[in-house]
Amino acid sequence: MRITNYYYLLKGWEGNIAIYQYMDLDYLLSLLESKQYFVNRKCHFEDKGESVLPPKSLFGLNSIGVQLNKDEITKMTQKLSEKLNRYRESASWLTSCWTKDNTESLLMWKNYTTKIGVRIKSKIENVIASINTDKYKIVCGHISYDGYNSKPFEECLFSKERYYKDEYEVRFYFIQKDESINSLSGEFIAVTPETMIDEVILSPYINKNAAKIISQLLREEYSLQTVKLSKIELR
């Protein structure tokens, strides 16, 4: 990891990488009005692997058939227990999911928005720069889709099963510096929207006439200069 004053960027990643997030229009309007960005905790995500590591992830192929003495078994058990506990605790971390796929995805529109949805464009460095609080340590990296097998805790945080590979996910963790805070609800984080948002694309499910009105509203009321209609043509 590369360490700066308050965020960690996984090795091999640069801050100027473009990233995208799909959301409902009312969520975007709330963000613009309140300058508060809602981030959920990963324990609320649909994927069970976000909260609990699958048993098969605890043992590598090299463990099969290997005879260990009592001390080695004790050390291995302690190590696995620590990994499980740390990962279970990470389920309460505030987690923001983006994609690095610059091509519109009908699957993403369907999964992450209702009919009235938008896709915002940003950069890793812009998301970080937009945060107006020092309450969190921020960790960012891309998700690998080769499962959790025999990986250390830190790599498990940025891993998923291959079923999710079409997401091309880039993930931010917002880890509270005050460890006494013990909440399972999401949080609104203070942001500067104009720093975070470079571009908005409107959902292909929005009526064309309505899309033009929404586009004008976003430009005139919220000074979002780059608002585009979706390139996906639907009946």
What name fits each language-model region?
Residues 1-235:
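Partner-binding and oligomerization surfaces adjacent to conserved cores of proteins
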